[in-house]
Amino acid sequence: MTALHRPAPTGAPVGRDRGGPLADHAEQFAKQLASATELGLIPDPDAVRAVWEDAAAPDWAGPALWLHGDLHPANVLTADGTFCGVIDFGDLFAGDPACDLAAPWVLLPDGAADHFYGAYRPAPDAATLRRARGWAVLRALVCILIGDAGVHGRPGGKPTWGPPAHVTLRRLVATAS
């Protein structure tokens, strides 16, 4: 990710619904949390809401960086448990790196996010890490709902997306400040 997150030139595309201010997604968060809770998929919505509220950090003030924007298990390739590639660069755009920095919460095993952030350069500041957790909550809720739709045969559903999203949410809640 360090190699990708470089300043984008003027005129680079911006994300359709990612990479901008996290606060712009408050309504989306509330709707997704309500839907997932109503379906019985979220055992402690208040804990999830607390993670989201903690992510209300100052907006990114640095230059717009190149972002993948869609880092989740279906877009990461592995071989024998080792990352070996990333696919689906169709959303490549410029914005706040916190959007991509949500990926360790979604992709890595328990306890690995801090190691990832320790190796990422330049080292992300506290506000960026808080926003990354907010992006991870959004991604987890979306994937939980897509997974549930798949389990129940609804259009657009992908049953394999739910389990890793539940793990992501559990990690975020367990590590909340």
Label each PLM-derived region with a short phrase.
Residues 103-177:
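Helix-rich C-terminal or lid/interface subdomains of diverse kinases
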Residues 28-29, 97, 137-140:
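N-terminal alpha-helical segment
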Residues 6-10, 57-60, 149, 177:
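Generic structural signal for secondary-structure transition and capping sites
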Residues 1-45, 61-64, 92-94:
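A cross-family kinase active-site recognition segment
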Residues 2, 6, 34, 53, ...:
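Surface-exposed alpha-helical segments enriched in charged/polar residues
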Residues 40-51, 55-56:
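Central P-loop NTPase core of STAND/AAA+ ATPases
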Residues 31-33, 84, 100, 150-153:
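Short glycine/proline- and charge-enriched loop/turn segments
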Residues 64-65, 72-133:
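Active-site Asp-x-Gly
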